Amino acid sequence: IVSKKIKSSFPSETKVILTTTAGELCTFDLNTKKDSLYHEANNPWQNIVLQSFSEDIIDKIEILTIPLFSENITSQTISHQERINKIKNEILRLNIPFKINHTDCFALTIVDGLSNSESFLTEAVYESGRLPCLLIGGSSGGKLDFQESYIFNNEQATRHKAVIMLIKMKKNMKYGVFKSQSCEKTDLSFLIAQSNMLNRSVQSVLNSKGNRIVNFVDAFCHHLNCSLADLKTVLADYTFAIEVDNELYIRSVSNIDIENKSISFFCDISFGDLLYLVKNKEFVSQTNIDFKNFSARKKSKPIGGILNDCILRRLLNAKNLNSLKTFEDIPLAGFSTFGELLGLNINQTLTALFFYEVENEEDFYDEYVDNFVHKYAKFSTYFTQREIHKYQLIAKVRTAVINSLKDAFPLIKDMVEILNYIYEDTTQTNKLIVEMTKKFEKFSNDIVSNV
């Protein structure tokens, strides 16, 4: 009802996209500067923040709605590739009415924040090859009971879908891509051996020293020298991340199941992923440093921006939110998300678009946009690389098992000879032992020849 009323307030040709949030971010109320970037969201709130863009900034826009097939996702039985293919087929059917060039076009994306499908979407996008541009945005938010989350796609409120705004900029407009995380990588990492991508839980990892599969919680407690009872307290100062092209993509913990010894995440973790432990840092100074570095080679200030800010940044830094003044002179808006997108799914991160008016496009530089072809290739091959890691892990475990069998062969042969000696007077038993010995020797030779 609310979304329909908002839509009806604008001319029919105006495209309106709305999302539920876990809190809103905004620097200006029309022409009045606000005291805090973060709107209050501790108690039930009914804020509506609207951000509009004129035809002087945006040349063309196409709204694409993609089904995610995520209804009852944790109980579904279709294979991973079947799920990717279903989403990819929906993408291949899309009508894209203009040519996509990554220098002036991007895909601002909002994914159903309760669908557990952000990575499935991105993998399908790269497999389809239909959107060769920046994929940036976030997952729709909502109350922290995680019961409802909606996206309005200019026509209706939707669930279990992703809404992509394919936006082409005017010739005198440029966009820059900003990313900020308040963490640093430690020396500790885990190679995932057993996980569930649908409920986003991890059960076991590979012990690098002995090529043994061990419980993730046990391994983590061992490395940090803490008890099960203290694990949640110790983890309060840490989170996890994968690494793509030397950049961290955070995977935040959603729950620690002490009884069943498993850890759940707000992003899916795959068998074969290399998961790094990262330590949290103070977020105000880090955001300031990141934005200073981002702005260093830009000759003008941005005329506006869109922020996708993880709900965990709001929750973990609640006492310092009002101290963040980095963007106070820039007209921008955004929301606290249930996850972010920047090429791949990510947590505990601020991803943002800033817009610039330029006279000569050759004078504008953005590290992300100028190196986009390289980054796109890394995002696209991430999923293939993950498959390679799976096979490498299987090969490691298989080799370890074979080596263990090889070590046991002499002992087993000795045992057979002892049995033969004990029962040498029993004709029938003797025949069985001879037959077993021949089979074992053949098995042994086959194994050794294949190692």
Language-model-detected regions and their locations in the chain:
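Hydrophobic alpha/beta core scaffold segments
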Residues: 1-451
